[in-house]
Amino acid sequence: MFEPFLLAVEGQEFLTGFHVEGPLAGLIIILIALLLLWIFKKVLKLVVVLIGAVVGYFVGEAVEPSLSLVFAAGFAIVGIWAMSGDKSKKKGKKQRSILKDADDWDDDSWDDEGDWDE
């Protein structure tokens, strides 16, 4: 049997030293799944930043080999900044549409001006 599910086996005192029954085992499995998802999210961000650093290194090698590590560090910093979240929320500003600032975006009065059939 797969070892993590041994906690859910009734009558087994594996690893914990106490008897685990259905609802508690389900709660433990759900909490472990949530922890793994949280860790995967963090690892995924780290992988994206590392890929950016490798791309920066290769760009640096193509441009100037002596600056390849500087390019890699720069791309890694940009990757960390990009993965840190939504920048507009941190500033407290709301995104506005271009149409909200325009005064006449729904002004149909130009249709009534002049007679085109003359």
From Swiss-Prot:
Highest taxon of the lineage: Archaea
Biased composition range(s): Acidic residues: 103-118
UniProt topology in membrane: Multi-pass membrane protein
Keyword annotations of the record: Cell membrane, Membrane, Transmembrane, Transmembrane helix
Biased composition (Basic residues): 88-97
Gene Ontology CC annotations of this record: plasma membrane
UniProt-annotated stretches for the region Disordered: 85-118
Localisation per UniProt entry: Cell membrane
Transmembrane region(s): 20-39, 46-63, 67-85
Protein name: Uncharacterized protein AF_1991
Organism: Archaeoglobus fulgidus (strain ATCC 49558 / DSM 4304 / JCM 9628 / NBRC 100126 / VC-16)
